[in-house]
A protein has these predicted regions:
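Formylglycine-dependent sulfatase
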Residues: 2-7, 14-222
Length: 222
């Protein structure tokens, strides 16, 4: 049985239980899913990291939902995040989740991706940022803006780590805009994505339909 089916059963069961407690609570919640790339849970203070303060992330953890038992059991590619994204969007384990564009076709045709299921439930769906899945985001989300397949175009300056302080002073810096990379028109890619998200939130505020936003940053990936 697919995980999606199990989730459906769990959600239905939860809904039945809640209806007994409060029949009035039938409103569908808005869903903002924030995807941080290669960010370990151990780097967030709310999850036990005490060396660095992360007040905004802590507030999100306190006011939202964190999945502390979610686990990626492996990958079929060197880019582990690619398998992770496939599993998240299809609800399938790593040994069953699609890998290539052709593998995704039956899943999309059956409208079994996460966003498609939510669209069927009446949600307006939105995606921006790093996708890295062999599906066309524009076909499974209502709105798909500035979709990146993976990382920015690589340049040797970005991967030649300085061997000493002198080499660092003379070399390229990650915040320099001349090679493009994480910069778009002088604005860092994280800010570009966040600006898109703010724009959609303002638009969604005028819409009665619930929304699902898939907000995928490249950060904190190096």
């Amino acid at each position: 049985m697919k995980i999606l089916s199990l989730l459906k059963v769990a959600l239905v069961g939860s809904a039945c239980g809640l209806s007994v407690l409060s029949a009035a609570k039938t409103e569908q919640p808005n869903i903002l899913f924030i995807f941080a790339d290669d960010l370990s849970y151990e780097t967030i203070r709310a999850h036990g990291h005490l060396d660095i303060d992360t007040p905004n992330l802590d507030r999100l953890a306190a006011e939202g939902t964190t999945f502390s038992h979610a686990y990626n059991m492996g990958s079929w590619t060197g880019a582990v995040c690619m398998a992770s994204r496939s599993m998240i969007n299809t609800g399938q384990f790593v040994w069953r989740t699609p890998r290539t564009g052709g593998d995704f076709k039956p899943v999309v045709a059956a409208r079994e991706t996460w966003s498609q299921l939510l669209k069927s439930a009446g949600y307006r769906t939105y995606m921006t940022g790093k996708w890295h899945v062999s599906m066309d985001a524009a076909k499974i989300f209502d709105v798909a803006v500035d979709i990146r397949p993976g990382m920015p175009k690589d340049v040797k300056e970005g991967y030649n780590r300085p061997v000493d302080e002198a080499a660092y002073e003379a070399g390229w810096k990650p915040w320099e805009t001349k090679y493009g990379g994480f910069w778009q028109g002088g604005t860092h890619w994280s800010e570009v994505i966040a600006n898109h998200a703010e724009g959609f939130l303002a638009e969604a505020a005028e819409d009665d339909a619930p929304f699902f936003m898939y907000l995928a940053f490249n950060a904190a990936h190096d």
